[in-house]
Amino acid sequence: MALDKLLEQEAQSEIERIRAEARDRSQMIVAQAQERAQALIESRQRALETQRQAGIVRARSAADLDLNAARLTASESGMSQVYELVNQQITEITRVPEYRDILGRLIYQAREVITDAEAVEVNPAEAALARELVHDIAVRENPAIQGGVRVVARGGKSGITNTLAGRLERVRGELAPQVSRLLAE
């Protein structure tokens, strides 16, 4: 019986050793699997965080673009309103007594450029005033001229238009930043 017991003990020891080895190996496999799982989780978290940050950047960029577009639209609308108001003021200026001096200067400046002038063209509403100011050449009515004068030479083949609206249009680009700044305040 002692041999049976001895064999049984050896078998039991071998079983315990194999179980211990299997336990160690399974613990090692589980630990490695947990490490891989943790690494995968961390990798996914980093990827998600990167995507989240990229999404935030895109959202901010889109919001900035929308804001700038809204500002630009508001600025353009404001600029249009300002120039519309200025054009209305120019139309009203032609009705004030001081317009005589303004029209006189516009005629003088245009005639300095066109030295061989044959005629001065003005709006029909300003023709009487222009005739008071110009005595040496013809004054013709031209409904297309508003708030200023057109001086013509060589049978109308050359000429220059000098109007308040034309002057405003020439400096509009230079005034735009200043007007925008004032509208933003």
Curated annotation (Swiss-Prot):
Origin species: Deinococcus deserti (strain DSM 17065 / CIP 109153 / LMG 22923 / VCD115)
Domain of life: Bacteria
Any single GO BP term: proton motive force-driven plasma membrane ATP synthesis
InterPro entries, per the entry: ATPase_E_C (IPR038495), ATPase_V1_Esu (IPR002842)
GO molecular function (one): proton-transporting ATPase activity, rotational mechanism
Family affiliation: Belongs to the V-ATPase E subunit family.
CC annotations in GO: proton-transporting two-sector ATPase complex, catalytic domain
Function: Produces ATP from ADP in the presence of a proton gradient across the membrane.
Keywords noted in UniProt: ATP synthesis, Hydrogen ion transport, Ion transport, Transport
Name listed for the protein in its UniProt record: V-type proton ATPase subunit E
Transmembrane stretches, start-end: none
Alphabetical list of Pfam families matching this protein: vATP-synt_E
